Amino acid sequence: MNIFFLFFSFLPAAVSLFLQVAAGAVWQIFIKEGLVKNTQGSVLFYHMIGLCVFGYWYFAVQGTGLKETAKKIKETGKNCSILTVIGIFVLGMLLCVLGNSMVGVEKYLFPSLVEQYQRMMENAGMGTSALTVFASVAVAPIGEELLCRGVTLHYTKKITPSFHIANFFQALIFGLVHFNIIQGLYAFVIGLFLGCVREKYNSLLPAMFLHFAVNASSLFLLGGLLNRIPDTPVSWAVCFVLSLAASVILLIIDKRPLFERTKIK
């Protein structure tokens, strides 16, 4: 195991933590000076900064420019069928159910931690503020994929020749960058799938779309359905097992990559 790249694998997460703290502090200064009134705008502020920082970092480690990136986007669009797009979106919905099922089970195992998590989400205005909705659905999928499946996975792949071990490390770091246990646990599991999608299609774009589908499903599509699930440990455990099994099956159905790895790295 390459200890040098193991250190670099955690460096993006440390930078993310610094940016979150710095963005929150700067936003408080904006509020104090009367420049802004909405305290929830700090979430979008952080994600916009992170998008710039990790976007530049990703292009730096990949050695690609805007021209090559545009070429890759065009190639992805050409080779991505409508069934692939639908499949990724359905996978996102399944992962949304999986994540909520994990929280449902954890509510009975770690009630105080789940209560703290729910209070934190409410204070952040998740699902209620237009700024946080835009940040979590439109901006976060891009920035967090650049951070974890872009920069971090680039370094974890240098630790070991095994993709599965490298994917485990990047998913672990993806869980850690959420900086709370409850969200970190389901982020870890979802991060495993995001890493597999990025590797399968040899592109960050499908992973970004999957991330968008997960977040959009959580906020807009599945709220009513999830509220109808009986609030018992057994019900949530069954939902977890079924959604996990369906997600794995859906992930492995289409074995065709979007394009040959020898053409575009």
Language model region names:
Residues 60-67, 251-265:
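Membrane-interface capping segments at transmembrane-helix boundaries
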Residues 143-169, 196-203:
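Membrane-interface helix/loop boundary segments of multi-pass membrane proteins
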Residues 17-25, 183-239:
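Functionally important transmembrane alpha-helices
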Residues 12-65:
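Alpha-helical transmembrane segments in multi-pass membrane proteins
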